[in-house]
Amino acid sequence: MIFSDINSLIMVFIYGVFASAISFLTVYFAMPKAIAFLLKKGMVVQDYHKPERPKIPRPAGPILIMGITLTLIVMYFLTFNEKILAILFTAIIAFIIGIIDDKKVMPGWFKPVALLIAALPILLLGAYDTNLNLIFGNAFIPLLYIPLILIAIPVIGNTINSIDVLNGVASGFILITGIPLMISVYIFGSVEVFLASLTLFFGTVAFYKFHKFPSKIFPGDSGTLLLGAMYGAIAITGKSELIAIIALLPAIFNSFLFLSSVKRVVEHREITARPTSLTDDFKLAASTDKKAPITLLRLLLVDGPLSENELVNKIFKLAIFSSILALISIVIQYYFVLGGKI
């Protein structure tokens, strides 16, 4: 990101504050009304990890997409940049796919296949660069990059969806790993994509207040697929693909463990043998069922049962570690790709 003068920097700052404020305030003030509405309509699910098994409203996806859409539309009319549109349409399509799955349990193949559609706006609007930033330089891969986009959006969308198993994990994970992504986009990407990353980050900050332990609302598939797909779209349009992969390593590892153990793409609600079990004092323990899939949670519980909040904090520590690795990678890229110049 290159600034020709101080006025450009000031303008980016003003736009950044504007984007952050719209996204945050929309989600923050609309979410309590959504919680009340969902409770009134009986759109709730039980939180099985709590002693009283409270009924928690779901989904939060509609409020998230409202805040993100409103902000990105405003940003588009301020910048008229096709990358903003590509990120917006990717987020909307991912949300629609998720809300369908929220309303009706779809087969395991539905989300990864349907999310291919969410990748199309990036391709159709040409909102990508075929020069892939690597750690020690970049690679020009025009033919390979298109299939990579078609793979990346479904993978990242489902990765965030798969790790959303405990209070606050999906939103907290996006916040932690969003920091290196924003920094990378600021350095290697464009002003417009950086503004979009602020939209995602501050919308998620507002949502985390309601999603953190103990959750007042769950994101649902519409929320997690939206967050994951938008994260992926920002990484692609902001020339920060490798940084995103490094930051998301714990979540990617979780998906890899799950798929390698069940050996097929399956909806998590179809799994009969759960990877974790509840003790009498409502702590989570690793399942002893040989048929249960291997997941990140199950591995973290090998040393013994943990409370839900303790387990969430362990996942966040992994996210912090992978994000630090991503930040180190940014420093290396900064010197090898840009020669130490922004």
Each language-model region and where it sits:
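Membrane-proximal soluble regions of multi-pass membrane proteins
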Residues: 255-309
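C-terminal membrane-adjacent module
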Residues: 15, 289-342
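"…together with the soluble PPM/PP2C metallo-phosphatase catalytic core" -> "…together
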Residues: 2-262, 321-322, 326, 330-333, ...
